[in-house]
Amino acid sequence: MTYRVKEIFHTLQGEGMRAGRAAVFCRFSGCNLWTGWAQDRPAAVCPFCDTDFVGTDGPGGGVFEDAATLAAAILAAFPYKTGEGYRPYVVFTGGEPALQLDRPLIDILHAHGCEVAIETNGTVRLPEGIDWVTVSPKAGTRLAVTSGDELKLVWPQQGICPESYESLAFTYLLMQPRDGLGDAGRGDAESEAVRWCLAHPRWRLCLQTHKYLGIP
């Protein structure tokens, strides 16, 4: 299988229950909910998307002809050797990573001692073997992934009721204030998310700490 990757980079996980953990991110190009082009944003399922996933021109990005080649590029992004008392953490994101992530790539990374995570919109079935699953549902879509480690809901999001996800088999329910609204809009989103979490204690507030820190 050929993989199209926007970028590969080493940073700290900024979101969710594993925030603060060092990881290599592999951002796949392409998504099934938006083309990524500005002129198509009004028709996108998630017009608030804040990610550039178009093309293969980012740092470490490119077209990789097979799983072994892509795995080698991911492993090379770690500034330390694998097997030094730490299990390397690889996060596949996008775009929509489930369109490209497959079992051969997962198996190679596992063979090198890596832990494999995915950040997905949940509309595409996942391959087996993923160690940590984060689903971020979008209004108007049907979930193909109804269980996992964390469900991360961007809020506010028109057309979604957070309580409708509480019966699904996720260990953690997270509410992430919507960005892309400007500083004032983000503040309002944070206030709404705080109010929801205070009134619904199954939910935890999830901030995008990497944006506050100014890291990728």
UniProtKB/Swiss-Prot annotation:
Enzyme class name: lyase
Binding site for S-adenosyl-L-methionine: G95, S136, P137, K138, Q176, P177, R178, D179
Superkingdom in the source lineage: Bacteria
Gene3D superfamilies recorded: Aldolase class I
Any one Gene Ontology BP term: queuosine biosynthetic process
Cofactor(s) of this protein: [4Fe-4S] cluster; S-adenosyl-L-methionine; Mg(2+)
Residue positions binding [4Fe-4S] cluster: C31, C46, C49
Domain Radical SAM core: 18-216
NCBIfam families: queE_Cx14CxxC
Protein name as it appears in the record: 7-carboxy-7-deazaguanine synthase
Organism: Nitratidesulfovibrio vulgaris (strain ATCC 29579 / DSM 644 / CCUG 34227 / NCIMB 8303 / VKM B-1760 / Hildenborough)
